[in-house]
Amino acid sequence: MQTLSERLKKRRIALKMTQTELATKAGVKQQSIQLIEAGVTKRPRFLFEIAMALNCDPVWLQYGTKRGKAA
């Protein structure tokens, strides 16, 4: 099962975005993206903004499931 950090990094790379580009689009610091991808930050406060910048569901990004689906 993938972690939040793995899903975020995989999605960012699929969109051919750098951490800096994602951070700018989401309105957060690049270091915040780096800490999430490193697995240091488990529950980012700007999860919704990051998910919108990645054009994905925030529930999927956090938990790896779609809304209403059990893991």
From Swiss-Prot:
A single MF term (Gene Ontology): DNA binding
Domain called HTH cro/C1-type: residue spans: 8-61
Top-level taxon in the UniProt lineage: Viruses
GO biological processes: regulation of DNA-templated transcription
Residue spans binding DNA: 19-38
Pfam families: HTH_3
SMART domains in UniProt: HTH_XRE
Disulfide pattern: none
InterPro entries for this protein: Cro-like (IPR000655), Cro/C1-type_HTH (IPR001387), Lambda_DNA-bd_dom_sf (IPR010982)
PROSITE patterns: HTH_CROC1
UniProt keyword annotations, A-Z: DNA-binding, Early protein, Repressor, Transcription, Transcription regulation
Function: Cro represses genes normally expressed in early phage development and is necessary for the late stage of lytic growth. It does this by binding to the OL and OR operators regions normally used by the repressor protein for lysogenic maintenance.
Protein name as it appears in the record: Regulatory protein cro
